[in-house]
Amino acid sequence: VAVVDDDNIPYKNWGKKLLINNKIKTNFYKTSSLAFDPISATNHKNLWHRGFPIQILDKRNNVKKKIKTIKPDIQADFWNGDPDIDAICRMEHHPICKFKDKYFPLASNKVSPFNSQNTFISKKVLPHYFLFPHIGRMDDIWASFYVLSKGFKVVYNKASVFQKRNVHDLTKDMLKEFIGYENNLNLIKDLKKNIKNINSYIPEKSRLAFLRYQTHFK
């Protein structure tokens, strides 16, 4: 299943030669930090992915790289143009990016944010992948933390779209991201302890919606 935003313009390679469910060699980044920032492993190291815990931004480059073979369940393709960064990062940099192919595919030993903008998800992940409503701009980010904490693996691949971002009010975006600024780090910690701890972070109506969604896979 592919999830794509309407402001992404696909390249000719979009959706071709997918990596999920195949054994592939990756640029694998090992970190002792609680989370990994995939953008930090590219030629745009000054930026960070939306959802990466801002409390550990100064540690995002503390990684060791090696070549490792993995079998990913999720493939998060990158995006040239306007990247998926948080409002703070966008206010500071206002970047237009061209990510170099040589950095991909890449993966890590730790939880890392991926979005619903240009992502391919295998069948076995679907019952667990849910864009939690009522949590602002963290719906897809917390979905990524949840499935990765359950043990599914993500690989980040080279850009397959150009994002021409729709008009946004960055102050409003930032307000919708505050739930993440405040909770992302602790959520990652708590999901590591017990996957059911997601229920301590999402509203009751989100929890019930997730339960209803999962009934479609029984």
Regions found by a protein language model. Name each.
Residues 1-11:
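Short beta-strand-to-loop acidic/aromatic patch adjacent to the donor-nucleotide binding site
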Residues 9-13, 163-166:
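Short catalytic/ligand-binding loop motif for oxyanion handling, primarily in non-cytosolic enzymes
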